Design a protein with these regions (language model features):
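Outer-membrane beta-barrel transmembrane strand signature
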Residues: 279-320, 388-431, 533-557, 561, ...
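Extracytoplasmic gating/loop element in the C-terminal half of outer-membrane beta-barrel translocons
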Residues: 405, 536, 577, 851-935, ...
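Outer-membrane beta-barrel transmembrane domain signature of Gram-negative proteins
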Residues: 276-305, 456, 462-565, 619, ...
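Short, small/polar-rich motifs associated with maturation and membrane association
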Residues: 2-345, 349-352, 356-358, 421, ...
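Small-side-chain secondary-structure face that scaffolds active or pore-lining regions
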Residues: 309, 324-335, 352-358, 364-370, ...
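Conserved small-residue
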Residues: 243-280, 513-515, 715, 732-827, ...
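Surface-exposed loop/turn segments flanking beta-strands in extracellular/periplasmic regions
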Residues: 262-283, 370-406, 453-469, 510-541, ...
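Flexible loop and strand-edge segments within Gram-negative outer membrane beta-barrel domains
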Residues: 253-255, 280-281, 285, 291, ...
């Protein structure tokens, strides 16, 4: 681990850089007064007025007026978010009136695409561009939460509730793979494969989502699951500005699994299971309360920016501390980043530097504590002083029955993660050739983390081992280089953009771990791991590993625009990766898309209410290489020892089959869409239809031995399709001086189908997936012609007079052979929807976001395991059991009875704020806000929460170790100096 002093030194250096960049304002010769108005002659508050080429400037006040000193030869640059920038010569005037044209909805908005940008009007692929104000307000431990419910076809789920260390699950246009990675490629400030947890959500400037194959094909073997391009706040010219954002958040449990209380537990046993009265004790214990706390978090972000057109900077410092709902579960972050832009040699050379430092410390939650708290006997006490071997905790010896308080108290787990990143983009503007520039981008990122776990003598499942210690270290170094040659120009009615590029990425990682047990005392925990007796007895374990991979790509793109009417984009990429087999090291990835702006045709020239109407179609091929290194190679492992020449010598044998034909998963996608804006850009409409076919799916298949060494081979066989539609409607129903209402609705539908799973050469007997511990069986099947995530099981017909389940086609013993199981549901929703609204009245603002999932099924493991009398006794059962009409059944069987509708409607976010604008020299703006998140869920699902994991091959299954979500209330403050 890098020592804390190193971090302190780096932070100090960054601060010195920042303050050295703060130059004095230029002293001018003449006072200029003016007013900045919009198209309705209403004043614009907070517009920037800057003397071009200097840091001298001003901000318009509450009446749109400004004061600035300038020479007659100076040019004023007037800009405001959402409006087109205007440049105005000072001349001999001392009083100016400047009008800005609204630009936030017009078609010249810049959209970031792969290795470049374009405008909305020229876009031919399926790309969604979100600016800062379009994203979710509130507080997030992960910036991905800002996108939840904002992009049609993009599902962002947090299946781990209020755990501050958890990741979001991200799916774009369905599941495309059986075993490779399913998440989109994340690119942050040009760094491909970056971890979105390593940026502060308050520093996000924009997020662009490349959804279809024609847009993502420029990224080759990494584009199958889509691409999310994140741009953080950049250096800007202007007077030095300091901004502080602070947030305080408290959470309360919204929905959770509720077991019987102590009194209910006693009553049920006495009335229905009197033979189990020996399990009734004298306590009244709320186990959930014993292991939880009120989650509280606070986040602080300080940013400093300013400079001139030749040299500008933006630097931010962020600190976050978040406590989870479970005790001893927390996350702490310290982040610093700076962006510097520099123009040299009379604009021949532009430099863009980024430096990032992130330190994270977190204590993960216990995955079993919530399940143990739910099932634990509520009449059992927490502590028992008569059992010193258990550390004074109450203990009943039974299989998988452990005191949840002891689980979280007698475990010390802490992870530390340090990330250091630096990159520079150098752009050579070859001015003799208009529109030609050469860009070179170099980045280096280093990640290192250490995990230390210690389980004391009294940890319930390890009593008798005398403590157990575990240490793991990991380090990864990632180097990227990218070189592109760009040319753009306009020749009359013809506009072209051409791109040629090369990219290289090398990743190298090392890891080591060790485990030991049998310590005399717990005081040293992991810091004297060698003293455990398991080491001297030969029972301790240790391992180490190193890996690397190399990725190379060549690419090109040509974009053509004729008369702003007919659009064409074509790209081609050739990728090579060390992960592929010797026979398939390289692959081609082409794409083409076209667009037709119909509103430019003569037959629509008189239709004034249509601002833009564009048809587009695209086809693109992408790949997925998100699988482990060395899968194509025959790996070796130790096989035993033999005695030779007076010493024991290790022998080695193959550990896996080689596959020289291993290659990427291939996705071919066809997309057609319509973009339309109307009524002076106050209403916009985007519709997409897509069909994507992913072939060469990777999976472990059964092979004969011989000729293979082992009977499984990781290879490319299967095929899956995803077909769907997406609709986005955005509008501004009201837009006056005092009142504005912006609204956005998204609707998505996707249908998944496994077209091919096996062939004549490769078969697989493990087509059963979705293991349920409660059911003690696999609940899903991989069957050609059906969707992934499809549940199979017996059909439930009801209960008989004895309260036993009656199943269709059951045998005399009540069972149904698996060969007779039928399709009983599918985990994937039929449609997902979201509706976001923002209202602004004078200086007040109010926003809310609703999100819905319609259709799809979920396996209610809680009901199957704990809503019957077979579980009661030593363990508790669900309080939902009390609402049943039949109280006598003591058996349960997996069937359609436990497959429930997963539809829901959630109110994700409500934010209310007020903004003050000041004309003082100290404070420019102050904003206070209150936000509530995860407010309510309307659903017919009888379990805890219908929003469960949908990725992987076991979607739609509620976990018995569910970490509850919380409703969060946040007070926020933003001050701009």
């Amino acid at each position: 681990m890098i020592k804390q002093c190193s971090i302190h030194g780096l932070l100090t250096s960054m601060l010195l850089i920042v303050f050295s960049l703060m130059s004095n304002d230029v002293i001018a010769q003449k006072a200029i007064r003016g007013t900045v108005l919009d198209e309705a002659n209403e004043p614009i508050i907070g517009a920037s007025v800057l003397v071009k080429g200097t840091t001298n400037g001003s901000i318009t006040g509450v009446d749109g007026t400004f004061n600035v000193k300038a020479n007659p030869s100076d040019v004023l640059v007037i800009s405001y978010v959402g409006y087109a920038t205007v440049e105005q010569q000072v001349g001999n005037q001392t009083q100016l009136v400047i009008h800005l044209r609204e630009d936030s909805k017009v078609l010249n908005d810049v959209v970031v695409i792969g290795y470049g940008s374009t405008t909305k009007k020229e876009l031919t692929g399926s790309v969604t561009s979100m600016k800062k104000d379009d994203l979710n307000p509130g507080t997030f431990t992960n910036a991905m939460g800002m996108l939840q419910g904002k992009v049609a076809g993009l599902q962002i789920i947090n299946p781990n509730g209020a755990d501050p260390t958890a990741k979001y699950e991200v799916l774009l246009r369905g599941t495309n793979t059986l075993s490779a990675g399913q998440g989109p490629l994340i690119i942050i400030d040009g760094v491909a494969g970056a971890d979105i947890r390593n940026i502060n959500f308050q520093e996000v400037e924009s997020i662009d989502v490349l959804k279809d194959g024609s847009a993502a094909a420029i990224y080759g073997t990494r584009g199958t699951n889509g691409v999310i391009i994140v741009t953080t706040k950049r250096a800007r010219s202007g007077k030095t500005e300091v901004s502080y954002d602070g947030q305080l958040t408290v959470g309360v449990v919204s929905r959770r699994a509720k077991p019987l209380s102590a009194s209910e537990y006693k009553s049920v046993i006495k009335e229905y299971r009197p033979e189990l009265e020996s399990y009734i004790f004298d306590s009244d214990t709320d186990w959930f309360k014993e292991i939880t706390q009120t989650p509280f978090s606070h986040k602080h972000n300080l940013s400093i920016s300013g400079g001139s057109e030749k040299f500008s900077h933006h630097t931010s410092f962020n600190y976050e501390k978040s406590d989870g709902l479970q005790k001893h579960n927390s996350s702490e972050k310290l982040m610093a980043r700076t962006n510097i832009r520099q123009s040299l040699l009379d604009k021949w050379v532009d430099l863009d530097y980024n430096l990032n430092i992130i330190h994270r410390k977190y204590s993960p939650s216990s995955t079993s504590a919530f399940m143990q708290a739910f099932t634990h006997n509520p009449t059992e006490p927490v502590y028992d002083d008569s059992d010193p071997d258990a550390g004074g905790y109450s203990r009943i010896k039974a299989m998988e029955y452990y005191n949840p308080v002891a689980i979280i108290n007698e475990r010390n787990m802490e992870s530390k993660n340090d990330n250091y990143g630096a990159n520079i983009r150098a752009t050579l503007n070859i001015l003799p050739i208009k529109g030609l520039k050469w860009e070179n981008f170099v980045s280096y990122d280093k990640e290192q983390y250490e995990t230390r776990e210690y389980y004391t003598h009294y940890y319930p499942s390890l009593i008798g081992t005398n403590g157990q210690a575990y240490i793991e270290n990991y380090q990864e170094n990632d180097t990227q280089y990218e070189s592109t040659l760009n040319y753009s120009n306009i020749f009359g009615k013809h506009s072209i953009q051409a791109l040629l590029g090369y990219t290289y990425q090398y990743t190298y990682s090392t890891s080591a771990s060790m485990t030991n047990s049998g310590f005399d005392f717990d005081d040293n925990q992991t810091h004297n791991i060698g003293t455990g007796t398991n080491l001297t007895e030969g029972k301790a374990s240790m391992s180490s590993n190193k890996e690397d991979n190399t990725y190379i790509g060549f690419f090109g793109r040509f974009m053509y625009n004729y008369d702003d009417k007919y659009l064409l984009s074509a790209s081609l990429r050739r990728d090579g990766s060390s992960r592929f087999g010797d026979n398939n090291k390289w692959g081609w990835f082409p794409a083409v898309s076209v667009g037709w702006r119909i509103n430019k045709e003569k037959f629509l020239s008189n239709v004034k209410w249509i601002d833009d109407l564009k048809l587009r179609a695209g086809y693109g091929v992408t790949g997925n290489q998100d699988f482990s290194n060395y899968k194509s190679l025959m790996m070796m492992t130790t096989a035993g020892k033999f005695y030779y020449n007076g010493q024991w010598i290790n022998t080695y044998q193959p550990a896996s089959n080689a596959n020289p034909d291993l290659k990427w998963e291939k996705k071919a996608e066809f997309n057609v869409g319509v973009d339309m804006t109307m009524f002076d850009n106050r209403l916009s409409f985007t519709f997409d239809y897509y069909k994507r076919t992913t072939s060469n799916l990777l999976y472990d298949y059964i092979v004969p031995t011989p000729p293979y060494v082992y009977n499984t081979l990781f290879t490319n066989v299967g095929k899956v399709t995803n077909e769907g539609v997406e609709l986005t409607i955005s509008g501004t129903p009201f837009n006056t001086r005092d009142f504005t209402w912006n609204t956005s609705l998204t609707v998505s539908h996707n249908k998944n189908k496994l077209v091919k799973f096996t062939n004549d050469e490769f078969t697989n007997g493990t087509y059963k997936v979705g293991w349920s511990t409660s059911a003690a069986c696999y609940t899903q099947r991989l069957i050609e012609g059906q969707s992934l995530g499809t549940f199979y099981g017996p059909i439930w017909l009801g209960t008989d007079t004895d309260g036993k389940d009656v199943l269709l086609g059951q045998n005399a013993d009540g069972s149904v052979p698996e060969e007779q199981w039928e399709k009983i549901g599918c985990a994937y929703p039929d449609a997902t929807l979201s509706w976001s609204n923002t209202f602004r009245y004078k200086k007040f603002d109010l926003s809310f976001s609703l999100r819905a999932s319609i259709g799809g099924e979920i396996l209610n493991n809680y009901a199957m395991e704990y809503e019957n009398l077979s579980s009661i006794g030593l363990r508790n059962i669900s309080s939902n059991w009390l609402s049943q009409t039949n109280f006598t059944s003591t058996t349960y069987k997996y069937s359609s009875k436990y497959i429930e509708d997963a539809s829901y409607l959630k109110l994700d976010n409500v934010t209310f704020g007020y903004t003050w604008d000041f004309t003082s020299k100290m404070i420019k703006r102050l904003r206070l806000s209150l936000t509530a998140q995860n407010i309510f869920c309307i659903t017919g699902y009888s379990g805890v929460d219908p929003e469960v994991a949908l990725s992987g091959l076991e979607p739609g299954m509620e976990s018995l170790s569910y970490y509850p979500r919380t409703t969060e209330f946040t007070f926020g403050v933003n001050i701009v100096f």
